[in-house]
Regions:
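Nucleic-acid endo/exonuclease domains
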Residues: 1-124
Length: 124
């Protein structure tokens, strides 16, 4: 397992319907609960090694973005955030979105409150 994942205290264990355990962060479990109502778990990628890496520029520096969730068969990347974190890092999030779309991916930001309510549509 990835050294970062092992040492990080911010990761949570999420048990998929098959019993496979995935390491997720923040509000990602809320998104997975929703996605598993529509997609098979094999169609939902969350492991860093299964995700595309998007290079983006912010403040004249090239950075690497590892998406939260990727659904390859529909080419959709989903970024999962709390409203507070999304707004706090607004310019970075917009840069990630732009470069992800420029790479040809569909892109959605899913914002949740603490009670697992998805805020739709989310307006800044």
């Amino acid at each position: 397992m990835d050294k970062i994942v092992k040492s990080s205290k911010s990761y949570k264990k999420y048990i998929m319907p098959s019993g496979i355990i995935r390491n997720v962060q923040g509000y990602e479990p809320f998104a997975l609960d929703i996605l598993l109502k529509t997609y098979q778990e094999e169609q939902i990628k969350t492991d860093r090694y299964d995700l595309p890496v998007i290079n983006y520029t912010y403040n004249d520096k090239t950075k690497r973005y590892f998406p939260d969730i990727w659904i390859p068969h529909i080419n959709l990347i989903i970024e999962v955030k709390s409203q507070w974190i999304y707004n706090k890092q607004l310019e970075i999030n917009k840069s990630k979105e732009k470069y992800t779309k420029d790479c040809g991916y569909e892109y959605e930001v899913w914002i949740f409150d603490r009670k697992a309510n998805k805020i739709v549509p989310y307006l800044v």
